[in-house]
């Protein structure tokens, strides 16, 4: 939509030797500020931004979107410990918990459940919401804004591919490729959902 990637180049996604890989690389994509993904570096970087902002007196919040599979990485929990230690109440992590990752379901991986108590044990304020419910998400953001003395995590229980009939809850669409016909179908279904949404633009 913004012309950063030529439409034809999109067809090279996850093809050997191209710059559009499953884990984005900031070396090859200059508009991507850093390389994150399933190695779990994102929360550490977001914590650094939050720490720096507080020390400089900047009244900003740092947000980090994590995948459920990503939180199997030790790096995430090291950052979680540090964030609680430094009482980073300007840090908000959102975990997209859809139960599917990199070609497998979470059921075949070491269990992360019970999940919320883990974050709470690390000193975080933890909220769980149905992640495909826009109003529930906005209410959780609103709650997080009023938490003092600790970081907040929102665990959003989502359905992967929600709103696209052939993608919903299908592990193969973790990194699947669409044809022109499937793209048009997905765009049509998503646009219909967007038109049906109420106005959730105001957060007090």
Predicted regions and their residues:
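Cofactor-binding active-site loop characterized by glycine-rich and histidine/acidic residues
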Residues: 1-85
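A glycine-rich helix N-cap at a beta->alpha junction
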Residues: 5-12, 83-96, 120-124
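Acidic, glycine-rich active-site loops and adjacent beta-strand->loop/helix elements
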Residues: 16-19, 66-73, 97-101, 132-134, ...
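Short acidic, glycine/serine/threonine-rich loops at helix termini
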Residues: 25, 75-77, 103-107, 139, ...
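Conserved thiamine diphosphate
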Residues: 57-60, 107-140, 191-202
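Generic beta-sheet signal
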Residues: 60-64, 91, 150-156
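A short alpha/beta connector and helix-capping loop motif
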Residues: 73-98, 153-155
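Glycine/aspartate-rich loop-and-adjacent alpha/beta segment that forms the canonical ThDP
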Residues: 134-204
